[in-house]
């Protein structure tokens, strides 16, 4: 760690001692350099009236390339509102930039400001469009609007997703009233633009017990007015979190789930929605009597039950179990809460000590050159055919706790110069990785083998075959992957302003090119195979407001359309070749009927 003192300014007289740099070392020095992060602080603010430090208006986190003289590789810029005591710490913008200051991603936040007057549990809010300044007032500064932008190094960004929030005010307590979302860049900071869906929420409470903000009605509607979801809830409002019933509206009915509780607030019964025969599956839960918080028995409507007991209360782990088929198994735990062994029904019946056992060596050995013997763990699988020779897996970790090598028992069959095949018991050692200055795998080597006599010794050797080499961009996305045969796959990232989408273009070693358009919700809008023998092959995908796939159009213009009900269950598929296939469901979600186009013709 390195610290520095910021330059005194009018906003922050006297400056501030801050962390200037952080260098981390994984302890293994032949697999990549150390990682160094530097920090820069701007626009510090001390409130003279409150005599309190409000924070820095801008914090820049710089990732330094320790393989290139600690030059700046990328930087994350965070902006904060430090205008006054009430808004301190609110993040107004974040961005990721390359060394030249070119943005790749950005998030913008906007907030509302209200003075808050409380008369007991009765709140009154007064909107403020200027800075909040008061010696006596309380304030409410909720997040109103968030926008995510994709730049990919260009000067202007494309809005890939937006969210807008509205809150209950006078007579309420600042609960979220509605939420709008758009991945088309059309919503706007005032929330009056087009949106994909909007969620409206209603609440209940119990003022006599100071319980508020229990959501009882949630409605999700699309920008076109379509009703997607409607869920209601009931509570025992004598308690803060006792939801007793959830009802989901379906197109032709509703799905009801009920809950019951004990005096400790534990769920003791859950009853699922009815199936097509009106039967409701239920589960009953019984808790151990010592702490009254760990489930020791589960019964269901079919008469099945499972049990667990002999709890290690230090860690809340059950050491004895019985499953639905009346089979028993046991778990061993050490003094640090780690599982050391598991025995199943066969092991308990035959007296075998374990089916799987775990050993831990958490202490690494250090020398002048770093870690000489990494920490490791051993997983042993009991082999009934070789009782004295377990199947072992050894996992080594570096100083970050990152798995850097795995050894497994194995058999290699070899033949040379016409000799017959020969089986050799070996340890199969995972290929070594070489990391870049930012902890990413830059080189991945093939696995190797070694004798069985050094299972717990870290194998430092690298395979002689050329490794797989990966190059990344500043967002840690692979831009080039070169295999040992020197074949290379490249990936380029751009943005499409028209569809507000990220375009990922992959070119393989044979120069085949495919572009994929992805919207701000992570859904694929379009794929284009650009190197087909007959020209481009394009497949497009369309979604409804809550990102359910409703339409697929192939390169010939053939359309496959899907329809859903309010339970997100697909009720109809219209395929250009097979026609219309329709489905009906019971309230529990079981398929009741399926009708294909051929069956429909037959009546």
Whereabouts are the PLM-identified features?
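Extracellular hydrolytic enzyme modules, especially secreted metalloproteases
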Residues: 5-12, 316
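Beta-strand elements of repeat-based all-beta scaffolds
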Residues: 1-3, 18-27, 36-41, 47-603
């Amino acid at each position: 760690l390195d610290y520095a003192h910021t330059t005194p300014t009018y906003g922050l007289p006297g400056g501030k001692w801050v962390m200037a740099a952080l260098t981390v070392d994984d302890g293994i020095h032949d697999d990549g350099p150390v990682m160094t992060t530097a920090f820069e602080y701007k626009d510090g603010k001390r409130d003279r009236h409150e005599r309190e430090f409000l924070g820095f208006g801008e914090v820049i986190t710089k990732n330094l390339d320790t393989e290139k003289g600690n030059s700046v590789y990328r930087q994350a810029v965070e902006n904060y509102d430090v205008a006054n005591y009430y808004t301190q710490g609110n993040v107004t913008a974040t961005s990721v930039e390359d060394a030249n200051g070119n943005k790749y991603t950005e998030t913008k936040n906007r907030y509302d400001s209200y003075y808050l007057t409380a008369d007991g549990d009765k709140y009154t809010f007064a909107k403020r469009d200027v800075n909040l300044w008061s010696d006596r007032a309380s304030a409410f500064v909720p997040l109103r609007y968030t926008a995510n932008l994709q730049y990919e190094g260009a000067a202007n960004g494309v809005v890939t997703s937006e969210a807008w929030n509205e809150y209950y005010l006078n007579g309420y307590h600042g609960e979220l009233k509605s939420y709008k979302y758009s991945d088309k860049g059309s919503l706007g900071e005032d929330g009056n633009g087009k949106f994909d869906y909007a969620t409206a929420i209603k609440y209940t409470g119990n003022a006599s017990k100071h319980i508020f903000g229990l959501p009882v009605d949630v409605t999700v509607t699309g920008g076109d007015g379509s009703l997607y979801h409607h869920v209601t809830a009931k509570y025992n409002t004598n308690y803060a979190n006792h939801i007793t019933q959830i009802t989901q509206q379906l197109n032709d009915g509703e799905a009801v789930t009920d809950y019951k509780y004990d005096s400790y607030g534990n769920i003791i019964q859950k009853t699922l929605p009815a199936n097509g025969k009106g039967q409701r599956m239920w589960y009953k839960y019984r808790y151990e009597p010592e702490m009254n918080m760990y489930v020791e028995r589960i019964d269901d409507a079919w008469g099945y039950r499972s049990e667990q007991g002999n709890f290690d209360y230090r860690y809340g782990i059950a050491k004895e179990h019985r499953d639905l088929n009346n089979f028993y198994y046991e778990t061993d735990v050490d003094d640090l809460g780690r599982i050391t062994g598991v025995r199943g029904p066969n092991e308990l019946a035959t007296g075998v000590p374990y089916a799987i056992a775990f050993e831990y060596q958490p202490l690494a050995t250090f020398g002048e050159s770093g870690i000489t013997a990494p920490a490791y763990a051993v997983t042993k699988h009991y082999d009934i055919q070789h009782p004295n020779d377990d199947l072992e897996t050894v996992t080594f970790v570096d100083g970050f706790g990152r798995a850097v090598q795995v050894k497994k028992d194995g058999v290699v069959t070899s033949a040379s110069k016409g000799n017959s095949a020969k089986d050799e018991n070996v340890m199969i050692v995972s290929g070594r990785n070489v990391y870049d200055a930012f902890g990413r795998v830059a080189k991945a080597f093939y696995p190797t083998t070694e004798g069985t006599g050094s299972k717990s010794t870290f194998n430092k050797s690298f395979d002689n075959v050329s490794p797989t080499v990966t190059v990344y961009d500043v967002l840690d996305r692979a831009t080039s992957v070169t295999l040992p045969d020197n074949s290379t796959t490249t990936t380029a990232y751009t943005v499409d302003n028209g569809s507000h989408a990220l375009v990922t273009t992959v070119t393989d070693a044979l120069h085949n090119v495919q572009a994929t358009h992805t919207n701000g919700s992570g859904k694929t809008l379009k794929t284009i195979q650009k190197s087909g023998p007959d020209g481009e092959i394009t497949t497009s995908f369309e979604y409804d407001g809550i990102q359910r796939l409703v339409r697929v159009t192939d390169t010939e213009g053939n359309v496959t359309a899907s329809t859903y009900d309010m339970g997100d269950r697909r009720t109809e598929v219209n395929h250009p070749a097979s026609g219309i296939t329709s489905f009906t469901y019971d309230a529990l979600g079981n398929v009741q009927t399926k009708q294909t186009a051929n069956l429909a013709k037959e009546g």
